[in-house]
From Swiss-Prot:
GO (cellular component) term, any one: plasma membrane
EC numbers: 3.6.5.n1
Pfam families: EFG_C (PF00679), GTP_EFTU (PF00009), GTP_EFTU_D2 (PF03144), LepA_C (PF06421)
Subcellular location: Cell membrane
Domain tr-type G: from-to ranges: 6-188
Signal peptide positions (record): none
Disulfide bridges in this chain: none
GO biological process: positive regulation of translation
Keywords (A to Z) from UniProt: Cell membrane, GTP-binding, Hydrolase, Membrane, Nucleotide-binding, Protein biosynthesis
Lineage top rank: taxon: Bacteria
Encoding gene, per UniProt annotation: lepA
Name the UniProt record assigns to this protein: Elongation factor 4
Keyword Calcium: no
């Protein structure tokens, strides 16, 4: 191993949302002189406006820093910033695979949260060296000793020499950097071996094409190298290689252990698959690097342009977004009510919201979304098994033997005062109690098995409001279980509106149908004829509301006069309304589609 490689340290920062990960990254950048005072702004690495507004990290970023340590040597530090939210675990697992070590940041006031745990386990699976860092020690409510104890008890890491830091005040930054140099091992790999780079992210540039962020594991890549993608076998010629300091800067070559980017005039987005291995076309490596686990979407929903003509734009936007967001999956679908659109798969509700907002902002689209739903497993009477990701594709009742739905194992960390509220919520959501564990005197970890369908609606919002924001949630899929599920349809003026169809538990169907009919009655404008709204299961109507017709006062001109004259006019009006009802169509406003989403609130 050359001296240059021995002085490289690749690390990432793992933390729960709001524990100060991005601020710590800012301080590290500032301390190593990567940014001047003028360029310094809060959350430098959160470059998307959305990330700033919500105060969360969505995309991972990679930065190369030079640090002169106390031993007089200059080290190259590659910091890979990762998201902390449960929906973005995939982004986290990608960045962990590119590192040798991780800083585990824990808030000195809040202690360990559920997602901190999930990410730590990911790091341990990847054999990373973990350095505990206790942040926000300048807060009046900080209890660093209690938090150190928690790290030891819950995770089993030795936290006796955990670094005490206040990223905001800039305390303990140098100690953190020294610990990175001392504890994290340098990357292994041979610069002369056949090339193997792992793509851990990519983005699209209008001038240069698709740009891949890579971690070089073996070999060297430079301008002019002919490269080959191992999953597709396509070859390209490298036009530039470089590193981020945070701004992109060209370098002569990237060798084993380094992190940077490769530009190779790749026109097609699909050719730079995240998790793929790049090798030298002339001297290829024998086999690809152990890739990422293929990501499985948990939540599906339909995305439709408000104007039918926006379909092509939506497709292009999704193609471009897919490049930076490896977890997004979509396929075209049509709906009677909404026209042409896409069925999209997401990792969770936050991911769905973020994708929708990015489409609306970055690509200037107006979208309608349908209610989110999970994938159901239908066992048919003829022995076939079908997977249904859209309620309208559910086979007819007489063909269904049983329907299974995905269950998750949810771990909720909560202060002991709120245990009752959380248990009540889980019970309402058809949860099965598994275990309850006191981590510290005031903190409890509850483990429940819940149907995923109950979590994707508003479980997280409710959890936060019932625990005053103190609870944190992490969940993992544990498989399918048989449930009493039915398909609830909405008929409007006798026509089935497919976008409103949902699959619900039989016990909930009546209340759900009732609430939906009430909500739609308020949202759909009155027509010239009366419009019945019916909630049906199969052929059975379980709830009905009627939107009254707007009517003109046809008797206004009759002063006094015979009753039969008035009756004739009223009958004539009634006849007209009846004819209208047969041919009339009802315009459904955008809010009505959104109502399906917020029905539980």
């Amino acid at each position: 191993m050359g001296k240059a490689q021995a002085n490289i340290r690749n690390f990432c920062i793992i933390a729960h949302i709001d524990h100060g990960k991005s601020t710590l990254a800012d301080r590290i950048l500032e301390f190593t002189g990567a940014l001047t005072e003028r360029e310094m702004e809060d959350q430098v690495l959160d470059s998307m406006d959305l990330e700033r507004e919500r105060g969360i990290t969505i995309k991972l970023q990679a930065v190369r820093l030079q640090y002169k340590a106390k031993d007089g040597q200059v080290y190259t530090l590659n910091l890979i910033d990762t998201p902390g939210h449960v929906d973005f675990t995939y982004e986290v697992s990608r960045s962990l695979a590119a590192c040798e070590g991780a800083l585990l940041v824990v808030d000195a006031a809040q202690g360990i949260e559920a997602q901190t745990l999930a990410n730590v386990y990911l790091a341990l699976e990847n054999d990373l060296e973990i350095i505990p860092v206790v942040n926000k020690i300048d807060l009046p409510s900080a209890e660093p000793d209690r938090v150190k104890q928690e790290i030891e008890d819950v995770i089993g890491l030795d936290a006796s020499d955990a670094i005490l830091v206040s990223a905001k005040a800039g305390i303990g930054i140098e100690e953190t950097l020294e610990a990175i140099v001392a504890k994290i091992p340098p990357p292994e790999g041979d610069p002369t071996a056949p090339l193997q780079c792992m793509i851990f992210d990519s983005f699209y540039d209008a001038y240069k094409g698709a740009i891949s962020y890579v971690r070089v594991v073996e070999g060297t890549v430079k301008k002019g190298t002919k490269i080959k993608m191992m999953s597709t076998g396509k070859t390209f010629e490298v036009t530039e290689v470089g590193v981020f300091t945070p701004a992109p800067r060209q370098v002569e070559k990237l060798s084993s252990g380094e992190v940077g980017f490769i530009v190779a005039s790749i026109k097609n987005v699909k050719d730079t698959r995240v998790g793929d291995t790049i090798t030298d076309a002339d001297h290829p490596a024998k086999e690809p690097l152990p890739g990422y686990r293929q990501v499985t979407p948990m939540v599906y929903c339909g995305l439709y342009p408000v104007e039918g003509a926006g379909y092509e734009d939506l497709r292009d936007a999704l193609d471009k977004l897919r490049l930076n967001d490896a977890a997004l999956i979509y396929e075209p679908e049509t709906s009677v009510a909404l026209g042409f659109g896409f069925r999209c798969g997401f990792l969770g509700l936050l991911h769905m919201e973020i994708v929708q907002e990015r489409l609306e902002r970055e690509f200037d689209l107006d979208l309608i979304t349908t209610a989110p739903n999970v994938i159901y497993k239908v066992n048919q009477t003829d022995g076939q098994v079908v997977f249904v990701d859209n309620p309208t594709k559910l086979p007819p009742n007489q063909k269904i033997e049983t329907i299974e739905e995905p269950y998750v194992k949810a771990s909720v960390m909560v202060p002991s005062d709120f245990v009752g509220a959380v248990m009540e919520l889980c019970q309402e959501k058809r949860g099965v109690f598994i275990n309850m564990d006191y981590i510290a005197a005031q903190r409890v970890m509850l483990i429940y098995e819940l149907p995923l369908a109950e979590i994707i609606f508003d479980f997280f919002d409710q959890l936060k409001s019932r625990t005053k924001g103190y609870a944190s949630l992490d969940y993992e899929l544990i498989g399918y279980r048989v449930s009493e599920l039915v398909k609830l349809d909405i008929l409007l003026n006798g026509d089935l509106i497919d976008a409103f169809s949902i699959i619900v538990h039989r016990d909930r169907a009546y209340n759900r149908g009732r609430a939906l009919a009430d909500k739609l009655k308020d949202l759909i404008p009155r027509q010239m004829f009366e419009v019945p709204i019916q909630a049906v299961i199969g052929n059975k109507v379980i709830a009905r509301e009627t939107i009254k017709a707007i009517r003109k006062n046809v008797l206004a001109k009759c002063y006094g006069g015979d009753i039969s004259r008035k009756r004739k006019l009223l009958e004539k009006q009634k006849e007209g309304k009846k004819r209208m009802k047969q041919v009339g169509s009802v315009e459904i406003p955008q809010e009505a589609f959104m109502a399906v989403l917020s029905i539980d609130k």
